[in-house]
Structures are given as C-alpha cells and as structure tokens.
Amino acid sequence: MKKFRNWVTFAVVLAMVLSLAVGVSANTRSKPAGIYGTIRGSSYQSTSNINLLNTTTNVDKNEDDAYFAIYVEFTNLSGVTSRETRSSGRGATSFNPSFAIYFTIDTVPSYAFVSHDIRGGTVAPSGYSCYTEAPVSI
C-alpha cells in the first residue's frame, strides 16, 4: 500500500509541474462595439494561484455610462460545474475581475467559457459582447 501511495504522490506532483511548464494559455478576442469603439476580452488561469481564472475586459470609450458584466461558466466532460457573474460600476472603460475555480473530487472543471459584455447605457442599452475560453487544470 505504501508503494502505491508513493506512486500516486509522484504522479500528482509530476502533473502539477508539467501544468506549470506549459505556461499560461490566454485567449484574447476583440470586436467592434459601436459607440464604445472596440470591446476586448481575455481570460486565463493564473500561474501564481491555479484556483483563479483572471479576466480582462476593456473598451476604447464609455461616454454612455454603461457597465461591464462578465459571465463565466466552468465545464468538464460531464457538463457545467459552476457559473459566476461579476459587474462593474457605470462609466468604466476596463474591468478585470478574477473568478474562483473550484476543484473537488466530484467536479474538476477543464474549461472556462467567458462572456465579456458592456451594457446598460442610455444610447446602446443592449450593449456588445465578445467571448473567450480558457483551459483550466490542477
């Protein structure tokens, strides 16, 4: 039994080292966003804390007093493991929230899908979106 436990410990440590060696896999997208210029979004798993998904969202200008809404859906082969949303204050031109990644025995997410939205303005209330995705691992 002790030999098996040592082998499992070695395998877990090796997997963690290899995941760090791969580096950050960031996904960045941008698209035209009307009166806001361009909306840009990025998402990636933190290298300093693997339990965090970092996101960045920005627009060229926000004279419409709109706000950012960032939606994250963590998934694995079995389906969705969790969902979270964060919103900025009105009038911001950038918003960079981080989201907790929950690794449990029952649910280990393997991917994060992110919707980067700007909405709620007076001229363009329905807003604009761009979408990113990022692999996540232990």
Summary of predicted features, one role per range:
Residues 24-25, 58, 82, 126-133, ...:
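Intrinsically disordered, low-complexity segments of exported/surface proteins
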Residues 1-49:
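N-terminal prepro-regions of secreted/extracellular proteins
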Residues 44-47, 102-106:
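Extracellular and analogous surface-interaction loops
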Residues 79-95:
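Solvent-exposed serine/threonine-rich low-complexity stretches and specific carbohydrate-binding patches
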Residues 93-105:
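Exposed aromatic-hydrophobic patches
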Residues 103-108, 112-137:
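Short, exposed beta-strand-loop hairpins at the edges of beta-sheets
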Residues 37, 92, 128:
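Extracellular and organelle-lumenal recognition/adhesion modules and their flexible linkers in secreted
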Residues 28-77:
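Short, surface-exposed binding/anchoring microloops in extracellular/periplasmic proteins
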